[in-house]
Every structure is written in C-alpha cells, then in structure tokens.
Amino acid sequence: MTQILSRISNPGDLQRLSATELDQLAKEIREVIIQTTSKNGGHLAPNLGVVELTLALHLVFQSPKDKIIWDVGHQSYVHKLLTGRYNHFHTLRRYKGMAGFPKRSESEHDVFNTGHSSTSISAALGFAFARDLKKEDGAVIAVIGDGALTGGIALEALNHAGHAGNDMIVVLNDNEKSIADNVGAMSTYLSRIRTDPRYFRNKEEVEEIVRRIPSIGNHVLKVMEKMKDSFKHLVVPGILFEELGFSYLGPIDGHNLSQLREVMTNACRLKGPILVHVLTKKGKGYGPAETNPSVFHGVGPFDVETGKVKKHLGPPTYTQVFSDTLLRLAREDERIVGVTAAMPDGTGMTPFARAFPSRFFDVGIAEQHAVNMSAALALQGLKPVVAIYSTFLQRAYDQVFHDVCLQRAPVVFAIDRGGIVGDDGETHHGLFDIAFLRHIPELVMMAPKDENELQHMLRTALEYEGPIAVRYPRGTGVGVTLDEELTTVPIGRGELLRQGSDVTIVAIGAMVGIAEEAADLLEAEGIRAAVVNARFVKPLDKELIIKQARETGRIVTVEEHVLAGGFGSAILELLEMEGVHCAVRRIGIPDEYVQHGSVSVLREDYGLTASNVARVARELADADRSRASIRMAPPAPIKIAFRGESR
C-alpha cells in the first residue's frame, strides 16, 4: 500500500522520484491519512486538500534550511509524512504519540508551533528579519488558508510585510474559492508570464527605453501604468495584495503538481514579498470529505467505506444542550442574538443560525471583533450570546476587559471546551479561562456540574444585567434528566450536596461529580466528607464556604484548570481575607502545558479522579488537626503522578 511513502525518510528523497511515482506517492499519502484518521480522528479534509501543494513545497524548497510555517497546523499531516515520521504516524493524536499540529520538539522540520489561526505570516516575517539581520540564506514560506486570512493578525502581518519588503513567500491555500473562482487557461498563462523572472527584467528594460523618449517619455509611462493597472483590476483578483506591497502570483490549480512546482520555483527566484494564490479542494480524493468538508474538517473515528462518523450512544453533549436551550430561549425573546468567530458548528450555533439568520453573526476568525461588537449590541438593548472555545477567548482578553466589563455591558459568554479537551493537545485545552477572567471587575463566572444545570445557568445569564460567563466542558453530559421548566440560579450561591464533618470537598463544574464519587469512597472508610458544588467562580458563595471551613477545618478544592490563579486560589484568597484558619489542599493542573491524549487518560495523569481526590482528603483528615494557618502541600519529590499540588 505504501511502496513509495515507506521509502521517504526526508524531503530530499522526493528528488529521485519520477512524475509517475510522485502521482502514486500522492495516492499513498491520501490513503494513509484516511486510514489513520478513521481510527484516531483528526483533521482529514484540510490535509487531503494540500497533498500536491505540500509535495511541491518540499520538492522546490530545502526544509529545514528553508522554513515552512503551517498556519493553524490543521494541514500539516502530509508535511509530517514527508519529513521522516511515517513509521510513527499511526500514533497521531494518541497519548504520548505524534501531535496533530506542528511541534518544534517533534522534528527540526517543524520550525514554528501552531494550533491557533492566522499566526503564520507574522512568524514568517520574523524569520525573514532574523535571516537578513544574521546575513544568512534560506527561503521563508507561510502557508495560510483563506479562512485564516480573515484573522486580524494575518492582515496586520500582510501590511507590515508589504511595507518591509523582505524576501518571503505567502502561500494562500484557498480551499473555498472565497477570493477568486477564475481558474483556466488565461489565468494559467498570466501566472506563467508574471512568475517568470524575465517578465520583471523585460518590464524594467521597457520602462527605461520609454523614459528616454524626448519630452513625452514620462507621460507615456504614466499612461502605460494606468493601462496596466486597469487591466490588472479587470483580470487579476490579487490586486489587494499588490496594493499591500506583494507580488501576486495566481490563482494556481492546487492539485496540478507540475504547475505548482513551476510557480514555486519561479517564486523563490523573485525578490520581495510574494503571494502565491493556490486553489485547492478540501477533502480531495475521498468522496464523503469532498461532499461534506465541514464534517470532515475535524472528525472523530469514522467508517472508511460509508464515511459515517462513529457516534457514541449516550447523553447529549454539553454543546448540544447549550444549543437546544439557546434556541428555546431565543424563540421566547427576540432580543437574543448569537455571535461566533468562524465556529458555528463546533459551538452549536448552527441551529440558531438556521432558525434566526438575521439574529446570527459569524464574524470569521476575529474573536476581538466578535466581543467588541457584542458589547455594542448589548448596550443597545439586545442580548448577545458569544459562543466561543475557551482557548480562543484568550485572543479577546482586552475586549472582555475594555469593551464589555468596563462598561458593564450585558454580554453572555458561552465558554465551550472549558477544561481538558483531549487529542488536540496543549493549544486547545481550556485551562486558563478562570485565571484570566475572575480578576476582571463586574464579570460573573459560573460553571455547571451537569447538563441540566447548564440550561438553568444559560437562562440565568440571559436575565442577568451585566457581563456573565458560563464555562462548560467538551463531551457528553453525565446523563441526568433535563428539567422542562427553566429557572434562574441565584447569583453567587453554591450548593451543599452532602453533609460531612471531617473534610469539605469544594468542586467546580465537571469536577463536582468526581468529588461526589470521592465522598462515597471516603464514607466506606468511615470518613465523612462534605461536598460543595461551588457553581460560581465569581462571586464565590462566601457564607457557605466559610461555614464549611469552620465546621470541618479542612478543605480540598478540585478544578479542571491550572492551579495558578484558579478556583482553588480564589478559595485561599477568600479564607485569608476573612481571617479563617483552615487546612487547604488544591487539586488541579500544575504550571505546565498539558499534552494531547484522551480526556480520561489525562485526568488520570493529573489526579483529577475520584480515587486521587479521596486520597488527598484522607491524608488531610488524618493529618494534624491544627487550624493555626492555611497550609499548602509540599511539592512532589519525584515525577508527579497526580500532577496537582496534592501529591
């Protein structure tokens, strides 16, 4: 099946292959990617669309001397296969296996880590500046999709790169034809002329000859320039890039390997910033992915023959419950509007968009704009719900502070993927939102213990007259019955789920269920553990927490979030401010990035399990009962098995 691919240990091996063998290699690459993602899940459609493009890049350029930066990184699988990682490709996105995104620690060919969108052009310009300052050689290439090009940072980088004028190449992988649709003989001919260095040399020679014509030379040049500009505006879709200072080449058929090689070869001979516009088809070579590219953009395990995604039977996902509840509430209140940043499917906003198209705003990959715009919507009496992944909300931090909270604009943040998300790894885990949101004045933040509480919290958020966030995890709910009638949750009120006199376990969000399981384990040992569902990160239920601290003298906090600045830190701050002496242990994520792997495996690795919570509570209950001071657990003397402070 992989007679050629299995022999590729580095990009240089491609030079020995004939055109026929390269075509066969492209087929083998597609087959390996399809088979692997069908088992492991992953970004299938983007990678199938860049097979020929990636081959052309590695045939023309010499990685890693020539630096190729993959924007977002969704489309880096082909690159990984061509850079000596074929034998490990079966571990893609598996725990301690190959990452699903470029990773510098994985290969010298991965020159810049990516995972979030629109960063490649900035990185490429930085590499170009460094190369020129150090008087080194080597090309720099950024590969960016038309979707990622909507990101503000990408446009900022284009503006700077065009002004700076350093040699670099931006490959625009246009797989939705959102910029142009003019592929054909004329565009191919124009591209060949404009990518040939002789065009630039002849252009300069002609200009010099005309300039020497007595009296009228300069005038003729101006007329010629106007004619050229008019012609370019008529037939060349890249005039925007040329106005920014780039030489525009394209559009190019992204599945014609020989044409891609020719254009890339000519592009690397040109001076200054170059933009190569390549048209590709997402999902190329696999029928189901070509038909439904959005479904197969990021997909779980699926049946290769039928293309059907393997769905796990069970409770609805938190995203689905959010989606259904929002739709239900929006039918009752026409002031509710939905906002997302290029993630309508992932955030569950698609049903809302279909039901209320005039009340739905997909702003593209522009989180800052989404939040800023939502503040204005809220100040005009509407009820904007910004549905966004936790990791992507980081991009709009200043807007949350400056445009929403400072004005106390009643914007609802539906923060999806709060916590460990699994196989996409460190760039996608939502482990920092509590820390970067809870210290902003005026912002209320809550997290439901289950899917039923989520729907009540969404109603609460939409009735609250100020900025408010609801944080919920990826994946299925716990399987509780969903109430028909939606009620509001009192702001800042937690819930005592279980009485106990020996120790109190205070948990937030999805960790509440684990805390209850831990209490069951402790009860079997004769240890009476109280369990508190905090519900609110901010404001905390001061009365309940202080009461429990004084009654039991011991608190264990549990959060699926970093310990630094997190929920446990908020509890410690509260106890210190109120002068309450209580032994405290915090369980959460330490000061490190969490790698990729299944949610269950990673929770086990970091001690976010009932058995570990019970162990920590047991040790605390058996320890010195003195309440003279708030104590922290000592750091682990060996490699952390349960990577919280609670080792």
Swiss-Prot record:
Family from the record: Belongs to the transketolase family. DXPS subfamily.
SUPFAM superfamilies: Thiamin diphosphate-binding fold (THDP-binding), TK C-terminal domain-like
Pfam family, one: Transket_pyr
UniProt xrefs under SMART domains: Transket_pyr (SM00861)
Entry note: cofactor: Binds 1 Mg(2+) ion per subunit.
Subunit structure: Homodimer.
Gene Ontology CC: one annotated term: cytosol
Gene: dxs
Organism field: Heliobacterium modesticaldum (strain ATCC 51547 / Ice1)
Positions with a binding annotation for Mg(2+): D146, N175
EC code(s) of this entry: 2.2.1.7
Protein name: 1-deoxy-D-xylulose-5-phosphate synthase
CDD domains: TPP_DXS (cd02007), TPP_PYR_DXS_TK_like (cd07033)
Pathways involved: Metabolic intermediate biosynthesis; 1-deoxy-D-xylulose 5-phosphate biosynthesis; 1-deoxy-D-xylulose 5-phosphate from D-glyceraldehyde 3-phosphate and pyruvate: step 1/1
Record field: catalytic activity: D-glyceraldehyde 3-phosphate + pyruvate + H(+) = 1-deoxy-D-xylulose 5-phosphate + CO2
Cysteine disulfide partners in this protein: none
Keywords (A to Z) from UniProt: Isoprene biosynthesis, Magnesium, Metal-binding, Thiamine biosynthesis, Thiamine pyrophosphate, Transferase
Cofactor dependence: Mg(2+); thiamine diphosphate
Gene Ontology molecular functions: 1-deoxy-D-xylulose-5-phosphate synthase activity; magnesium ion binding; thiamine pyrophosphate binding
Biological processes, Gene Ontology terms: 1-deoxy-D-xylulose 5-phosphate biosynthetic process; isopentenyl diphosphate biosynthetic process, methylerythritol 4-phosphate pathway; terpenoid biosynthetic process; thiamine biosynthetic process
Residue numbers binding thiamine diphosphate: H74, G115, H116, S117, G147, A148, N175, Y286, E367
Cited Gene3D superfamilies: 3.40.50.920, 3.40.50.970
Biological role stated in the UniProt entry: Catalyzes the acyloin condensation reaction between C atoms 2 and 3 of pyruvate and glyceraldehyde 3-phosphate to yield 1-deoxy-D-xylulose-5-phosphate (DXP).
